[in-house]
């Protein structure tokens, strides 16, 4: 009985960390949609999620780098992405997503629209913000 109780406690403790890792609301604000257009500066195609960075110019010519979190690589492939072909450093993109709660230039990506008009999903839906 004691072994069973220990095993159940260990399993439950593991599920808490998994749930915390996948808590959109803990890191992002579904009430604050954002759309930015800029040039892809870097792509980190890795598990558990990809990250891509977009340099966005303001009206005065200053550049701010936005960090976007996307789906895991295997989910992006199912959405039509190809690791070295879909999005490349230097591409101009428009990204829609939801702002991070803490970092004002970080967001959870939802959709990426490319210069040729092609639009691909890059992350889950969240919040009430529409596009």
Describe the function of each predicted region.
Residues 100-124:
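OB-fold/S1-family single-stranded nucleic acid-binding modules
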Residues 19-34:
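Short boundary/loop segments of OB/S1/cold-shock single-stranded nucleic-acid-binding domains
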Residues 36-40:
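Conserved hydrophobic positions within beta-strands
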Residues 78-95:
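Short nucleic-acid-contacting surface segments enriched for D/E, G, S/T with interspersed K/R
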Residues 128-131:
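Glycine- and charge-enriched low-complexity intrinsically disordered segments
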Residues 46-57:
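Short aromatic-glycine-enriched beta-strand elements
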Residues 5-17:
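Bacterial N-terminal signal peptides
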Residues 62-74:
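Short, basic/aromatic beta-hairpin or loop at an interaction surface
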